[in-house]
UniProtKB/Swiss-Prot annotation:
Its cofactor is Mg(2+). This is Anthranilate phosphoribosyltransferase. One of its GO terms (cellular component) is cytosol. 5-phospho-alpha-D-ribose 1-diphosphate binds at residues 72, 75-76, 80, 82-85, 99-107, 111. Anthranilate 1 binds at residues 72, 102.
Amino acid sequence: MLEKIINRENLSFEEAYNLFKELMNESDVRIAAYLAAFQTKGYTAEEIAGLAKAMRDYAIKLELGEVADTAGTGGDGSSSINVSTASALILSAFTKVAKHGNVSITSKSGSANVLEALGLNIKIPPEKARKMIEKTNFTFIFAPMYHPALKRIMPVRRELKVKTVFNILGPLANPAEPKFQVLGVNSPDLVEKMAEALSFLGVERALVVHGMGLDEVNPRGETIVAEVNGEDIDMYTLTPEDFGVERVKVVPCNSPQESAERIKAVLRGEGKVEDRNFILINASAALYASKVAEDFREGVELVKGILGEPMSKKLEEIICTSRS
């Protein structure tokens, strides 16, 4: 199949699925060649879905019922705080969340990095994950623990130090198979493709977002959105005004520790207005995608109502349960 990809021929869903199986047994050189060739060719929605389905099927099984997830492809170069992780924590005050993530590959702080900086034990095995989500509505699925099939591929990906198809696949490969999802992408070209891939994978409702260079809902301007409802996909744009929130700039973040402190400040009902508004609109999008909120303005009001003591206690409960 390598020659086919080099010749810029697209793969079917089944071919992409089988390609993942092949990669598990290939040499480092051929894995690197596949990743580079795929990156040069670009990917179709069908290819993305086929690879993601294979990743899910070869992952350690995790049956948690209907859950939500918030994730981004990363690689947008913004060095922003971990907004999708903050949104997942807030969302868990309303519904079950299985946050799938990893340490940083292309940014300063991945979801695993910031959760560890917050004090969580990120290495949660399946049985504990089930108990944790029952008790707290939240669990973290640390990708390296749940995707043993990637052991051959990940060292090559790290050595390449460039974006690959696995930046895109990570947010789709949650072994808990979330029914509800917000998925941020680092390129406008990926919005519709990823929405189609999520539809292929059977999501109930999802929002795929790109905010003028950000793989988040943009607090300073427009965000392109693909809303997935089963097989239906609607494209539209959002601005902070649609949330009833004032526009703010994105303040860069230098480390997981800084991101954790700034997130904690917002959860306490404090923090900079830039961080607060950024988290408000993204958490609202997560509430809407999960069918908790009827619209984005209601989502913001629900989030505002939980910030402060309720979210501080919620975070402490999640941390303590992860470590017990």
